[in-house]
Amino acid sequence: MKPYQRQFIKFALSKQVLKFGEFTLKSGRKSPYFFNAGLFNTGRDLALLGRFYAEALVDSGIEFDLLFGPAYKGIPIATTTAVALAEHHDLDLPYCFNRKEAKDHGEGGNLVGSALQGRVMLVDDVITAGTAIRESMEIIQANGATLAGVLISLDRQERGRGEISAIQEVERDYNCKVISIITLKDLIAYLEEKPEMAEHLAAVKAYREEFGV
């Protein structure tokens, strides 16, 4: 685990974005942890979040021309990541996002920001069922652009309805790499460093045994 990944876990815990306990997911599964990126909701939170996304992007080595944030949660993430890349990595790259409803006046269309072209890095909070990615792919392809990769905050590394995860399905269907700031494996490594969190570690490991990929 790299220092920025450890820092991200501490940051997520401090904001209660990452919580341990018993949570029922949309799928009906009972999970020993929950991640709600919507709680990164202040200016400082967003600035820090952008730095973690930028760090993971640079660390991945994937080449891309533009950041795309799917509405709605992806919009602030794409914006803060673009700022962090420019401020901390000297990479001044364009960004763009979609509207859920197309405008029929003014500039029109359903895209805001830079022209959607070239190699696109899609940024979002998490991938649950992959629906937002599929909708975004239609927009990217309709504009003649290509998908360079997908960046999310957390990869839960758990099976979907079948034997593989929603993330593995996206990688297979779109022949792209999905990268994340942290994975379930990183989270377990972090818990292993904290004796006071042994109870949570046991629960998360048991969950991985049952649902992990």
Curated annotation (Swiss-Prot):
InterPro entries: OPRT, Or_phspho_trans_dom, PRibTrfase_dom, PRTase-like. This is Orotate phosphoribosyltransferase. Belongs to the purine/pyrimidine phosphoribosyltransferase family. PyrE subfamily. NCBIfam families: pyrE. Pathway: Pyrimidine metabolism; UMP biosynthesis via de novo pathway; UMP from orotate: step 1/2. GO terms for cellular component: cytoplasm. Catalyzes the transfer of a ribosyl phosphate group from 5-phosphoribose 1-diphosphate to orotate, leading to the formation of orotidine monophosphate (OMP). The keyword tRNA processing does not apply. Its EC number is 2.4.2.10. 5-phospho-alpha-D-ribose 1-diphosphate binds at residues 26, 72-73, 99-100, 103, 105, 124-132. It catalyses: orotidine 5'-phosphate + diphosphate = orotate + 5-phospho-alpha-D-ribose 1-diphosphate. Homodimer. Coiled coil: none annotated. Keywords: Glycosyltransferase, Magnesium, Pyrimidine biosynthesis, Transferase. Its cofactor is Mg(2+). CDD domains: PRTases_typeI. One of its GO terms (biological process) is pyrimidine ribonucleoside biosynthetic process. Pfam families: Pribosyltran. One of its GO terms (molecular function) is orotate phosphoribosyltransferase activity. PROSITE patterns: PUR_PYR_PR_TRANSFER (PS00103). Orotate binds at residues 34-35, 128, 156.
